[in-house]
UniProtKB/Swiss-Prot annotation:
The keyword Metal-binding applies. InterPro entries: FAD/NAD-bd_sf, FAD/NAD-binding_dom, FAD/NAD-linked_Rdtase_dimer_sf, Heavy-metal-associated_CS, HMA_dom, HMA_dom_sf, Mercury_reductase_MerA, Pyr_nuc-diS_OxRdtase. GO terms for molecular function: flavin adenine dinucleotide binding; mercury (II) reductase (NADP+) activity; mercury ion binding; NAD(P)H dehydrogenase (quinone) activity; NADP binding; oxidoreductase activity, acting on a sulfur group of donors, NAD(P) as acceptor. Gene3D superfamilies: 3.30.390.30, 3.30.70.100, FAD/NAD(P)-binding domain (3.50.50.60). PROSITE patterns: HMA_1, HMA_2, PYRIDINE_REDOX_1. This is Mercuric reductase. A metal cation binds at residues 11, 14. Binds 1 FAD per subunit.
Amino acid sequence: MTTLKITGMTCDSCAAHVKEALEKVPGVQSALVSYPKGTAQLAIEAGTSSDALTTAVAGLGYEATLADAPPTDNRAGLLDKMRGWIGAADKPSGNERPLQVVVIGSGGAAMAAALKAVEQGAQVTLIERGTIGGTCVNVGCVPSKIMIRVAHIAHLRRESPFDGGMPPTSPTILRERLLAQQQARVEELRHAKYEGILDGNSAITVLHGEARFKDDQSLIVSLNEGGERVVMFDRCLVATGASPAVPPIPGLKESPYWTSTEALASDTIPERLAVIGSSVVALELAQAFARLGSKVTALARNTLFFREDPAIGEAVTAAFRAEGIEVLEHTQASQVAHMDGEFVLTTTHGELRADKLLVATGRTPNTRSLALEAAGVAVNAQGAIVIDKGMRTSSPNIYAAGDCTDQPQFVYVAAAAGTRAAINMTGGDAALDLTAMPAVVFTDPQVATVGYSEAEAHHDGIETDSRLLTLDNVPRALANFDTRGFIKLVIEEGSGRLIGVQAVAPEAGELIQTAVLAIRNRMTVQELADQLFPYLTMVEGLKLAAQTFSKDVKQLSCCAG
């Protein structure tokens, strides 16, 4: 390790600029620059020119000398002394160098962790091999919700409960224009919420390249611009996310199938679309494409949402079939071929032909290229990094958060995990509690859940009682002329405490957070029933569902308390 003494720096931003300049010098592997101490600690290759180091610093207007070199002039100018006095007044007397935190990734978990670590006083290096922002803003949540919204509007123009007095019209879909509008909003949000924030934070240095562990204290970064750099750290967070999984179906890899990434970026709407998958991404996009004009066939190995309460899958299946989406339950593709611009799927129910094939059967952690074994970081059989509730891995100084772990794959979970990981990396003690985690699927009707289903509660030895309220009992749904779906409450028998809610409703995502707060605050179903809810809102359905435990809500007048 080579140390430089640097005079003239006046702030942490100065140190960041010096670090950047030194790391551009040939032979410099990494640099840790401390403004309070006035030093730069360098990992350099043998033969690196000391003159090149001091010249790089001098080019920024500062003076640098090797720490073990004899002083050439003991006289310090008044300006330098004043800079030293000002710096000493602004900083703690301990003059300890900032904790060096490396974050691999730039999505929800990574950004939350980087910003929290800086808030806690750390210096952060963020490493991203691709586009800043991760899955959510670029190829996930944001573009998919825009496409779903477009499809919803197209559907209402074509068909609504008010067609008798407002005749429907067949919409013209200009997919290229819609895609341009979608991508413009993606780029706007990426800059506002990711790139702009990183650019404006002097305590965060961004490296564009692919990282792999050298050991449990350093990384090797293959820079996108060429060459490699060794980056040392005190703490490291792995937040590399996940990618679409590809099932081992013969012929699939040789075909031009879509994942969600390609589907969201397509500038055309296929006439026929086959979808392999039976959960969130598959079903959101299946319905969106159907509403934009595709003839959609969904292949489900089991039933739709087979891991959830059976009533959820039944309700969504009924809604899909009512819109003309073909749902093939208990159906698997055993062979995929692509001939003459057409997909041919061999299934347990015969042959299926389509113009495009969307495969959305889950996601796999982005951990294979990280050389985690070099740092002693354990993964499970699926390649997900094993962590505890504090996001700690099996290696003491390395943490992980988000979709590269076995945490639920929601961006808000990833962000919460990243924040708590940063607290723990900087000396705190925070845990991630997912006992009241909401989940929303943006089909129409939407699916929203929190807490236990009945089956999950019974698996954990909890005796339950439950009620299911269909939406024809909810005034808001009646006023909307859309009574598809239900609200189901699960309570602990004996105590009456609410422990789970499952909802299928056009606006289920807007009501579930009330259920989250009720569960978090250990409310009984009677306490929920006694609350004031505004009339003609969908969330009032929670109150009505709670009332069904003690009375027949069909016999109540409007908004009866």
